[in-house]
Amino acid sequence: QIFFFFSSTSEPVTPVTAAPQEAHGQRLEHFPVALLSSVMGVSGLTLAWLKAHAVLGAPIIVGEGLRGVASALFGLLLLFYGLKALRYPEAVKLEIRHPIKVNFVPTVSISLLLLAVCYLEAAPELAYWLWGAGAVLHFGLTLAIFGSWIHHSHYAIQHANPAWFIPVVGNIIVPVAGIRFASPELSWFFFSIGLVFWIVLLTIVLYRLIFHEPLPARLAPTLFILLAPPSVGFIAYVNMTGTVDGFARVLYYTALFLALLLASNAIRFLRLPFFISAWAYSFPLAALTLATLVMSAHVPGSFFRPLGMGLLALLSLVVAVLAARTLVAVWRRDLCKPD
């Protein structure tokens, strides 16, 4: 099977019979890189609340507190994955060679880029180094993953799913802070990569969804990733141009339509059991929330302000539920299981 790497709390818990040290080692070996998508979700929530402070007058302490949580979460998860890489390098190599898992490896570089935006005003120097490290790492990962797509021997159309957008989205995130730290041409370079290949991959993914079997339940939450490229693209474009023009509106309303399409299938998503892949709900929803708040700032007296408030409330609820369900899964030892 191609979708087995997301653990679920709906599965029965296997009694632990191994020695404690051996059990801990096994869990570390199977620590999923996809768990770093939770950092993207919390960072996105942070940015939404920080923007809400500027646009809606929301308490700044909420955004600042979430920024600390996102930073600590990234450090903790990166530590665990680093230990996994040192102790079980073959397990990491298997993830990199996996046709689906490999798309979650860039969550590391994307987390750095998002944290850079989180610290953009509070600690510009720290934000610069986070952005630089994230941009360089993500560009390298983009070349590696795109190269594997071209010179592959193990990909099939069934492997195509919205998670393939993750490497693309990172390139669109680079200009959000990059326009402050480097030449505008560099920001346009990354933006162009992300936007063009988003359209290419969107065609492939839609073909797979329409003409082949539906996504398995464990990958169904990744459909929300469809929201991310146009939402982040809108934010990056407005940051680079300083205006909401016709093209910016095309990006935003594309994201809004996709959100309405997903909302019309809300019952299906609510009926799904919890998987780690459910964190795919968080960052795309955060990106749409942030984009809506940006629209509210540029188009005053419109419905974007109440829409942004509603999306912020929904996003906060979604992240809180995901965090609670993840902690329950950790308590029950349902995470980090063998495939």
Label for each model-derived stretch:
Residues 19-48, 63, 67-70, 89-114, ...:
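Juxtamembrane helix-loop boundaries in multi-pass membrane proteins
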Residues 50-63, 118-128, 176-188, 237-247, ...:
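Helix-coil boundary and interhelical linker segments in multi-pass alpha-helical membrane proteins
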Residues 65-76, 126-139, 187-198, 247-257, ...:
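Structural signature of hydrophobic alpha-helical transmembrane segments
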Residues 74-87, 137-145, 198-205:
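Membrane-water interface of transmembrane alpha-helices
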Residues 113-150:
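A generic, well-ordered mixed alpha/beta core segment in the N-terminal half of proteins
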Residues 144-145, 176-177, 200-209, 232-239, ...:
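Alpha-helical transmembrane segments in multipass membrane proteins, preferentially the mid-helix core
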Residues 193-252:
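Aromatic-anchored, glycine/proline-accented short structural segments
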